[in-house]
Amino acid sequence: MRRRRSLLRLVAAIAVAGPAMAALTPASAAASWETVIAPSSFNDYNALAAEWAYLYPWGSDHNGSARMYGSATDHNHVSLSGGVLTLRAARINWNEGTSGSSPHLPIRYHSGAVHARDQVVVNDQFPNWEVKGDFQAPSARGTWPAFWLTGVNSWPPESDILEFKGDNRNWFNTFRTSSDVDSTIVGVSSPGSWHNYRAWITKVSATDVDIHYYIDGQWKAVHHARGFVGKPMWLIINLQMEGSSGSPGPSADTYYRARDVYVGRSRNY
């Protein structure tokens, strides 16, 4: 009975995948489907701690002017309420130096980030992955929210499922190398309202995957990702500021919200 339920869940996931279904092989269609991160992971702080860790995987800084803060005892910038994760960026008025990551911008904000404890790795055992969630994303100049995958041991690989850079356009990006990038830019009506962002990732050869990108259930693009097979990736939700999203950023607090984030995969053995 358990095997039958798993198969039914896989069939349902494939049906929702739309164009991605054609990329599935008969072997993968016969696999079982399993949940890696359930939509309930933002229900309370115990559920959050079981599936997510605070900050970026590498620490507090990245490529913008916000430094990430958050812990089990500090919820000023990473908080939960009613099943919704809220990241809050607040401008600071003191000198906190520069970011430890290139391009080493001056720190002008405190903000929040979380990353999943489980990693996404496409291989023979787990050839298909679904990564999705509902988000209210800021889109004012200087705001840089993201929902993305990036390499654990090297960069690239990278897949940006949600990325707004100071306007109402979402950037679906797939980095194969630092200079070999596919970008599909899609205008989103009212990014600050709830929208669903989704990636369906499927193994298509011994080394490569296809990544299908969706907004609100509508297929937007497929990117061919050479060399992604076997490379573990972190899943990150963060609110960075300025940098590629322009400056100056807002003086008032900025909020980025997420709910019903889900990660699932097919298992061949």
Residue ranges with predicted function:
Residues 157, 179-184, 218-223:
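Surface-exposed loop/edge segments in extracytoplasmic proteins
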